[in-house]
Regions:
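Switch I (G2) and immediately adjacent beta-strands of P-loop GTPase domains
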Residues: 60-80, 260-288
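Conserved beta-strand segments of alpha/beta enzyme cores
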Residues: 115, 276-278, 369
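Short, Asp-centered acidic motifs that coordinate Mg2+ and/or phosphate
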Residues: 277, 309, 339
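A glycine-rich (often HGG/GG-containing) alpha/beta subdomain
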Residues: 1-153, 157, 161, 332, ...
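Glycine-rich, N-terminal phosphate-binding loop of Rossmann-like dinucleotide-binding domains
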Residues: 97, 247, 282, 314-317, ...
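Inter-motif core of Ras-like GTPase G domains
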Residues: 293-317
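Generic enzyme active-site microenvironment
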Residues: 279, 313, 341
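C-terminal-of-GTPase-core extension/linker across diverse P-loop GTPases
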Residues: 2, 7-16, 20, 152-271, ...
Length: 471
């Protein structure tokens, strides 16, 4: 990324950087051209030294005072010049985590020339001052919101610039060729080519492959970020709610021998192997005249459409091989993983394994996974969890490959791919350099919107408004 010139904003902002509410420590952050001067007016160091004269990246013990009245004893950490998160002078007060203290310190900063920070304004300044690319800034929000090992690793990799460097490398190579083609336009009367066309074709092929790979990774990245949706489906009274309770190890769903008890979907998140799974207990699927139950059945079918994994419960008493195979084939969706769960096997003789073999043979090409469980007795629930964890690991080599998790990035990559395909078509049609340059510039534009090389205030406002105030 081309570093932008450091922007010392005319105003200095302040906000609580840690979570709100009572706690042991609260960090209050000042950032802006006058941050250190404002801090020096309200902070009295026990060393008697002025913060203005202190070196950058130093910590000072002292008191925060208003009209000679001590508000709190705290630590003041100072960052001078551009050597801070925001790329401008920053002071962070580590105070005791009283709501009253936090309120008084912020009021004191406001009274001495600061203003309240807007949502995400610290990170926005980091972007504007060239400390972060735009997609890295978005990854900061994802990192804060991450609730599993997988989502944490993906966000961390992007925040540290993995995705940024990949996009910038593509953009730079394309920019180099664009410059040569633009140069050709200046010598159009001399009919010379500065850009090697065969080399350019190879570059286009590389860019297309990379863009396609990144676009395809979004389906994986989205579930890693938001949790893998797992629909628990089957006939009424198949044991779906019992399975959800067994997976969670708590009584989350109502369990009853009365068929049709579950009328609506119940969703709970469980972390298995560092990955979030969103288990969805659905209404039993059957033909019914009950209007409310029918709505539940429709919702169940909608969840199947959106799920990455479908756990289909059955038992050998209430289901035939034909019924099971028909259900899977009618609800089959390319890309989803279907897992057959032969439930209530504590009540079934071992001979029913032939029943299972017949099902798998009938569903060859649709699924090859069948587990025998007893949700009520907890049999093979651990094996089911292990299977799901192993399946999730096959989705992506987390932490190794770049995974797209942001819909904005996905759309920009898709637009860039369309533009680069137009360049490729133009090459095949032997179009002139000026026409090729139009589509090349469009590709560069879309790639630039990802890292923030190309941006506008409306887009920035939308992105940073999703942040918490102190970040």
């Amino acid at each position: 990324m081309n570093k932008k010139n450091t922007i010392y904003n005319s105003d200095t902002i302040v906000a609580l950087a840690t979570a709100s509410g009572m706690g042991a420590i609260a960090v209050i952050r000042l950032s802006g051209a006058n941050a250190i001067e404002i801090a020096d007016q309200i902070f009295k160091s026990y060393s008697k030294k002025s913060l203005i004269d202190a070196p950058s990246h130093t910590v000072h013990l002292g008191t925060l005072e208003a009209k000679n009245q001590v508000i709190d004893e705290c630590l003041a950490t100072i960052f001078k010049g551009t050597k801070s998160y925001t790329g401008e002078p920053v002071v962070e007060f580590s105070c005791h985590g009283s709501n009253y203290i936090v309120e008084e310190v912020i009021k004191l900063c406001l009274a001495n020339g600061a203003r309240l920070a807007e949502a995400g304004e610290f990170t926005k300044r980091a972007f504007l001052n060239g400390k972060l690319a735009l997609n890295q800034a978005e990854a900061v929000a994802d990192l804060i919101a991450s609730d599993s090992k997988a989502s944490h690793q993906v966000a961390l990799q992007q925040m540290r610039g993995g995705f940024t460097s990949e996009i910038e490398a593509l953009r730079q190579e394309l920019l180099n060729f664009a410059s040569l083609i633009e140069l050709e336009l200046d010598f159009s009367e001399e009919d010379v080519e500065f850009a090697d066309r065969s080399q350019f074709k190879n570059l286009l092929k590389t860019i297309k492959t990379t863009l396609s790979s990144l676009i395809q990774s979004f389906s994986v990245g989205n579930v890693l970020k938001n949790g893998i949706p797992v629909a628990i489906v089957g006939k009424p009274n198949a044991g779906k709610s019992t399975l959800l309770n067994a997976l969670l190890n708590e009584e989350r769903a109502i369990v009853s021998d009365i068929a049709g008890t579950t009328r609506d979907t119940i969703e709970e998140t469980l972390h298995i192997g560092g990955i979030a799974f969103r288990f969805i207990d659905t209404a039993g699927i059957r033909d019914t005249q009950d209007q409310i139950e029918a709505i539940g059945v429709q919702k169940a079918k909608e969840k199947i459409e959106k799920a990455s994994v479908i756990l289909f419960l059955f038992d050998d008493k209430d289901n035939t091989v034909s019924e099971i195979t028909t259900f899977v084939k009618e609800n089959y969706r390319e890309g989803a993983k279907y897992v057959l769960l032969h439930n209530k096997t504590d009540l079934s003789p071992e001979e029913t394994t032939a029943f299972d073999d017949e099902i798998l043979q009938s569903l060859k090409g649709y699924t090859d996974t069948l587990l025998r469980i007893s949700a009520k007795e907890g049999q093979n629930i651990t094996e089911l969890k292990n299977f799901l964890a192993d399946y999730a690991q096959t989705l992506s080599h987390i932490g190794k490959a770049t995974v797209v998790t942001n819909i904005r990035h996905y759309e920009a990559l898709s637009n860039a791919l369309q533009a680069i395909e137009k360049v490729e078509e133009g090459m095949q049609m032997h179009l002139s350099g000026d026409l090729l340059a139009i589509d090349i510039r469009e590709t560069l534009y879309h790639l630039g919107t990802i890292t923030g090389e190309v941006s506008n205030e409306e887009v920035l406002g939308n992105i940073f408004s999703r942040f918490c105030i102190g970040k």
